[in-house]
């Protein structure tokens, strides 16, 4: 999962529109998508049915689709063999994604560029000590993992 963020007027909606045109009109759209995997836009009321019939695609969707924040969507993403690019400024608490896969979309003059939002990481737990006994149960909580 990759997340693309950005302020208004940075090209997020334009990216989705261009991908949609390329998908619907092919070469006559004037948009040339260079990618080894098919790139698809997921949107609309039938999103779940469409997603269940897509395999091995790169799927783009944006925050205009209300389903992006639902547990139902998160469950479908977790059970899918597709790669997802989600364009949103919201936190997606139901989905597991890496901070290394959050990109910002920013405009520079008349050109749009992507840049990593979080460029450095540090290890939170630097040393793992061996456990002297086998626990019967291990409880963990991670609200951002989606589980």
Give the role of each language-model region.
Residues 15-16:
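Post-Walker A alpha-helix
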Residues 96-147:
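RecA-like P-loop NTPase motor core
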Residues 4:
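Hydrophobic anchor at the beta1->P-loop junction of P-loop NTPases
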């Amino acid at each position: 999962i990759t997340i693309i963020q950005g302020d208004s007027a940075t090209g997020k909606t334009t990216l989705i529109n261009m991908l949609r045109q390329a998908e619907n009109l092919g070469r006559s759209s004037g948009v040339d998508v260079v990618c080894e995997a098919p790139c698809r836009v997921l949107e609309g009321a039938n999103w779940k049915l469409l997603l269940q019939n897509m395999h091995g695609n790169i799927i783009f969707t944006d925050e205009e689709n209300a389903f992006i924040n639902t547990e139902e969507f998160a469950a479908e993403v977790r059970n899918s063999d597709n790669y997802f690019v989600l364009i949103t400024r919201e936190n997606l608490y139901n989905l597991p994604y890496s901070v290394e896969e959050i990109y910002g979309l920013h405009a520079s003059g008349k050109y749009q560029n992507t840049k990593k939002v979080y460029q450095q990481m540090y290890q939170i737990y630097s040393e793992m000590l061996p456990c002297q006994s086998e626990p019967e149960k291990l409880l963990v909580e991670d609200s951002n993992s989606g589980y």
